[in-house]
Amino acid sequence: MKRKLIIKNFPVIVLTVLLILSIGQTVTASGLFGPLQTVSKQDGGLNTAIGYWYHEDTYQNDTNHTVRQNEIYSQAAYGAKNIWEIYARIGISDLKIFDIFNSTDASTTTNKNDFEENWKFFGTLGAKAFYPINKVFGVGAFIQGTSYFSNFTDDIVGTISGTPFTTDLKVKNLWDVNFGAGLQVTIPHGIKLYAGPYIYYSEAEVSLASNIPGLEYSAGDVSIKNKTMLGGFTGLDIPLIKGFHLNIEGQFSDRFSAGAAVSYTY
């Protein structure tokens, strides 16, 4: 009896272990990955979604900086046979980088410490594949990449030994790519729970318009990238009414990213 009980609940046990491992990871990635299995109809069809994503990460060159973003996006996807899906997103995002304007030179003062810019457009492409082991348990994998269409720019003013200055910092060519795999369990009412690990790489170029003593960055492009390439994710997909689904997802690290999306299956 105990053996049958363990076998019956094996998918839930494995999923729980993955959730624990995911929480222990040290990085987050940009955007929802979504359920491992497409929500499109069995015979093939379109689904669309609108979503929001709150993202935090640590980027580094010689110094670590916390990065925060709020993303709003619209998605169109096509999937079939409950096993594959391709999708595209278009959205807008802000960008905040903490303590990037701190001066290490006592003769230089600045009017603020943090970089902030609002609402630049980005695009995302992704694909996923799913293998149903049985009606409850399945495994899947995905790849997803995001690129921003324009630069983020913020102005800064201050003084150097009492002499005023004005300059700006640009964050250019911000992009990321993610690849992951996971397990999915379907529980009563068609609710899908999923979790797994992923690898993640993100990069951007940072440049200051002019050289300012004491500021970390200078004229000329300097590359920054995410601090750690490994992460974990978990989420659930909840059927609502008349083709609508609610997707809630978190990506865990020393910082936390999370978001939600509402999709409609045609």
Where are these regions (language model features)?
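Short glycine/proline- and aromatic-enriched beta-strand/turn motifs that initiate or cap beta-hairpins
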Residues: 25-82, 86
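Residues that define the transmembrane beta-barrel architecture of outer-membrane proteins
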Residues: 44-46, 66-72, 101, 117-123, ...
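Transmembrane beta-strands of outer-membrane beta-barrel proteins
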Residues: 46-50, 86-88, 123, 139-143, ...
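Transmembrane beta-strands of outer-membrane beta-barrel pores
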Residues: 52-58, 90-96, 129-131, 145-151, ...
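Extracellular loop and loop/strand-boundary signature of outer-membrane beta-barrel proteins
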Residues: 58-63, 106-116, 163-170, 218-222, ...
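Solvent-exposed loop/turn segments connecting transmembrane beta-strands
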Residues: 62-67, 94, 135, 226-228, ...
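Outer-membrane beta-barrel transmembrane domain signature
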Residues: 78, 131, 135-137, 144-244, ...
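Outer-membrane beta-barrel "beta-signal"
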Residues: 124, 238-239, 254-266
